[in-house]
Amino acid sequence: LAGLDLELELAQLACASFDNGFWVYDPISFSLVRFDQGLNVTNEVANLNQLVGAEINPIQMVELNSWLYLNNPVHGVFVFDSFGTYSKLIPIPLADYIQVRENGVFLLVENCLLKYDPFTFETSDIELPVEDYRAVRIEKNRLYLLQDAAVLIFSNTQ
């Protein structure tokens, strides 16, 4: 990789993508760029602010099943297809963290865990069994809560 310059010095976010690719968000040009496994640009979306009609400042980016999710706490979660085409906004602002699973988008909003169903557009609360945690994650019907000195694991039916 010596001598390779992808011009990503100012990139703010990156996430894994399908077929061993990755997405990068550049906050200076407000652009999304997807690279394939050979580090070739496959998709580029210029000026996201103009595209979505809002000034965005995403804090997290996740891809699942060829859908790209940009967590922007001011507006919600912007969703793009595998080509970078803007699809929709999940209008749930103030999320500190999102996790995208097959059965929904999970959002941690002001210490409350919400589940957004992209098929019914319904939002439901997931009651957390403890209040003292640093991070939360859902994997294979289990709820994981990270505390300072432990990881708590609970059965999850959501």
Regions found by a protein language model. Name each.
Residues 22-24, 67-70, 104-107, 142-145:
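Conserved beta-propeller blade signature
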Residues 36-40, 80-85, 117-121, 156-158:
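Short loop/turn segments that connect beta-strands within beta-propeller blades
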Residues 31-33, 78, 114, 152-153:
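WD40 beta-propeller blade core
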Residues 7-19, 52-65, 92-103, 130-141:
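Repeated scaffold domains used in trafficking and secretory/extracellular systems
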Residues 130-158:
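Blade-level signature of beta-propeller repeat domains, shared across WD40, Kelch, NHL, RCC1
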